[in-house]
Amino acid sequence: MTLTIDLGNTRAKLTLFSAQTTARTTGNTAAQTAILEHNSVTHQHLVAQLQQMLEQHSNIQRICWCAVGTVPTALTLFLEDLPCHVQQLLPTSPPAGITIGYRTPETLGADRLAAVLGAQSLLPHHTVLVIDAGTCITFDLLRSDGHYLGGNISPGLDMRLKAMHHHTARLPLVTAQGAHPSWGYDTLTALRSGAIWGIHHEIMGYIAQVRAKYPNCCAFLTGGNRYDFNISTQTCNFADESDAIATDNRIFADEYLVARGLYALP
């Protein structure tokens, strides 16, 4: 089995891949997934939870991981002492066959690289555009020849709603939940619809721009807010790559892209 660890600023996502994993399907991708909240006080708790998972699954032979920000010393020491193969994804040292066009790879989030690697593990002969909708929205592009062209970062949904409230005198703070018609019929729906539909058109605009240059590009939507923007998506349950030919209206949704990318490391 392979354990992947996606270590973010406030949480870690641990995903187990069994030997029977079918790379192209979603349903049986992960034998087990755990989301662990962590901060400077609970790093030891994170290590303890990781130790518990390793004890429960003694056949884990490989750990592939990536981290955003500072890696807890306790975790580093723990991983160094493990008898199994441990591999960290670093944008400054990409896997064989991958080249980085980002001018400052040391500032590139490893999870962003892992996500495009995960998308390309599903469609190895396609250019892939990964849109990760979380606190911020990231757009990352990996060409079919393995060249990471770069990416953009845009404010996420909650950030946009809060910014309109904090940087104006009279606009209220609205939540993302609620009516969001194409055209707002009052101030609350105008703010919410402006943010949600603005992101919708932003995402669709990026996809159209990339596909104009790379017609074989497939787009992937991931992240906690991936279903909030009125975008029609399909799961990654396709039999083979020929079943996933990019079209103007085909976008795949997958929550395991980062884990898939780590699992695909050579």
Model-derived regions, located:
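Gly/Thr-rich phosphate-binding beta-strand-loop-beta motif of the actin/hexokinase/Hsp70
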Residues: 1-27, 119, 125-148, 164
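N-terminal phosphate-binding loop and adjacent alpha-helix
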Residues: 12, 24-74, 158, 163, ...
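Intrinsically disordered, low-complexity terminal tails and inter-domain linkers enriched
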Residues: 18-35, 232-249
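Short glycine-rich phosphate-binding loop at a beta-alpha junction
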Residues: 59-69, 86-88, 214-225
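Glycine/small-residue-rich loop that forms an oxyanion/phosphate-binding "nest" at active or ligand-binding sites
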Residues: 67, 79-119
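Glycine-rich phosphate-binding loop plus the immediately following alpha-helix
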Residues: 108-110, 114-127, 149-192, 264-265
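Adenine-nucleotide phosphate-binding core of ATP-dependent small-molecule kinases
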Residues: 179-218, 251
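Glycine-rich phosphate-binding/hydrolytic loop that grips phosphoryl groups
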Residues: 248-266
